């Protein structure tokens, strides 16, 4: 397949096989989008930068951490990002993709069936506030993330209960302020986590600034978290 429209910053991060899989995924998402609208980010830079690059670069940026052969959780996966992107670039990892909308999880299941992923991939239609209190899911993941735009403290309340001790949470943010940093530190103290590292990047093709906050579970999160549906959003810790 032709690669002239793919930014060089992305090509430099991927193997030939991975590029081909992302191109195949793009085709399948477009086909699916014609039947059921799951995302508007399907063409050009919207796909290659806002979907693909934004999903994979955090796991390339923290070079001192091994992200291979892990149990990975994508919360609020939407049309499958970053979970399916992580699956392509980390074929030895086991992937869980969760979304509360059945329309989205049905679409992801179709994508998983149509593309030859090497991973063991699980797609679950439920809310994280419910799943986090199931013993089969809680404290069960090496890595958890969500690209859903939300308060970092709220996202941390969803992520940390799912992590094994010393597991990593990947928080996606736009611009990062001192006030947000202080609020997150306060939340992490309650949830028994800590900030491990932070990276900032200018996304290719003028797609804006992206900050990634890498958090880590120090001790198992208190059983009462996450709180009931709606509370983490309305009243962040």
Curated annotation (Swiss-Prot):
Primary localization class, coarse: cytoplasm
Record keywords, A-Z: Cytoplasm, Methyltransferase, rRNA processing, S-adenosyl-L-methionine, Transferase
Entry GO CC: cytosol
Subcellular localization: Cytoplasm
One Pfam family it belongs to: GidB
Listed GO MF terms: rRNA (guanine-N7-)-methyltransferase activity
Positions with a binding annotation for S-adenosyl-L-methionine: 76, 81, 128-129, 147
SUPFAM superfamilies (UniProt xref): S-adenosyl-L-methionine-dependent methyltransferases (SSF53335)
Top-level EC class: transferase
Signal peptide start-end: none
Biological role stated in the UniProt entry: Specifically methylates the N7 position of a guanine in 16S rRNA.
Family: Belongs to the methyltransferase superfamily. RNA methyltransferase RsmG family.
NCBIfam families attached to this UniProt entry: rsmG_gidB (TIGR00138)
Protein known as: Ribosomal RNA small subunit methyltransferase G
Gene: rsmG
